[in-house]
Amino acid sequence: MKFFNFLIIIFISLTSSIKADLNENLINQLEEGGKLIFIRHAYAPGSGDPNNFNLNDCSTQRNLSEEGKKQAKSIGKFFIKNEIEIDKVLSSEWCRCKETAKIAFKDYTTKSFLNSFYSSKFAKNKDKQVKALKEYIKNYKNNNNENLVLV
């Protein structure tokens, strides 16, 4: 089922008038619904994860800073302020992604196919995850034409 119009959101620094036009256009697109919205986790200082990384232990991961928590709140406020309908929020199992989803949208479900395969430790999962993500999107049913958010 071809449900989604794909929308790529890129935040760049532009002049105020261009940003206002882009922002209005973006809001209009999201208000229409039926979009697949990819959101990267909010600010978590550094890159990658420590060598002792454990998916089930947030203390071994890079987590949101206070600035990141404020960013996540701002994301949620943006959707509420603009009355952008969300059907479902899916997050990877990484703590910074779950925390972003929780702060911004409150309700979310984790899906391992959204997990990072950035490091060599997880690269072996890439093909399986991409296939599962494509399958999920292909079979996703949304009768209310709301948006699907992936963090």
Language-model features, listed with the residues they occupy:
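Generic structural signal for beta-strand residues in well-ordered domains
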Residues: S13, Q29, N82, K141-N142
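Sec/Tat signal peptide C-region and signal peptidase I cleavage site
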Residues: S16-A20
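Internal catalytic or translocation cores that form aromatic/hydrophobic pockets or channels
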Residues: V130-K134
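Active-site-proximal alpha-helix that buttresses catalytic centers in soluble enzyme cores
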Residues: L22-K121, D127-Q129
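Sec-dependent N-terminal signal peptides
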Residues: F3-L14
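Active-site-adjacent alpha-helix immediately C-terminal to a catalytic or transition-state-stabilizing loop
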Residues: I137-V151
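A generic secondary-structure signal
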Residues: F78-K81, E135-N139
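Hydrophobic alpha-helical segments, principally membrane-spanning helices and signal/leader peptides
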Residues: M1, N25-L26, I137
